[in-house]
Amino acid sequence: MLIRFVLASLLAGLALSATAQDTPGALVEARTKAVVSTLAAQRAEFRADPAKLSAYVREQLETLFDREYSARLVLARHARSASEAQITAFADALTENLLRRYGDALLEVEGDLGVRIRAETPLRDGKMMRVNSEITRPGQPSVPIDYLFARSADGWRVFDVIVEGVSYVQTYRAQFDALLRTRTLDEVTRGLVEGTLSVDE
């Protein structure tokens, strides 16, 4: 369930890159309706052509999700001895593996999904920002989702999503730490690419 919400919230909240005046909270709030509307309007088309859905998801995630920085945090101490090429390969493989397994779950995102920004908290002298939000669904309890952003040369980019208190980075850090105690990073990356290795929800 975690990954379904992570992908849906990343895509729904972070669809387009921010302009200079956009704060992370404003970006999350402003873009949610537009992307949820697109998913709802093109649901039948995406179901009929999974490749089109995959291309759409990749395009949206690419604009604001800092997959390499996120991958470094997931790898933690294992990133210290890895080359830039190895980290990039791992980041790409992990993202593709998750999209391959859970991308279709985005088709379950309903058009009446909403978002409410509760707070923005600057971190590390303003270099990072935590956005506390809630995903709202009619007749159902709201789901707390926090986004962690880092400021880069390209603007604000998200590197972690925390759904109901469960962090994407911390969840996979624990799983990959266990794997990397017995395998090399290249072996783990290859397993993700080939589909012989999958991470749990």
Task: Name every feature range the model reports, one short phrase each.
Residues 1-7:
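Bacterial N-terminal signal peptides that target proteins for export
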Residues 79, 96-97, 122-123, 137, ...:
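Solvent-exposed loop/turn segments at secondary-structure junctions
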Residues 92, 100-143, 195-201:
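Surface-exposed, charged secondary-structure patches
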Residues 160-201:
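Low-complexity, intrinsically disordered terminal/linker segments enriched in charged
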